[in-house]
Amino acid sequence: MPGTSPAAAALRLLECGVDFDVLRVPEPAGRWALRRLIGYGQPALRPGPVALEGASACLFFVAPGAQEDLPQLLEWLDWGGIELGLRAYGAGDRIPEPRVWLHDPQAPAPEVIALLATIAECCSRRLLRRQYDRETVNQSRG
């Protein structure tokens, strides 16, 4: 993923589905997943390029085909039917070239299955934390 100036990056769109697909993960779950994946220290679980999309999401660049495979993979990992806040971009989609990279933009895009269990778990914990925080606030008001 070649780096460019911020002004040029705002105008440049990256075509998904050929060299990579993109998995959009809510932030901070994406940052937490990235730290865990790097912390494993295992080449098979090494993330590829990861970018920040504003303050709301992390973009994990993965091998093409992830968009098509995501629903079945989530089902296989027992996360099917749970709204984790994930979105995949693939063939026919374009995204603005990221301005902020959290992990090596030149790294090869891994297969999504290598990362998905960790990402899904982090998203689930994010949802549980939000629910816990809401319940705690409601209890303190009541």
Predicted features by range, described:
Residues 1-55, 64-68, 79, 102-142:
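Signature for HUH/AEP ssDNA processing cores
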Residues 59-97:
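A contiguous pocket-lining binding segment that forms or flanks enzyme active sites
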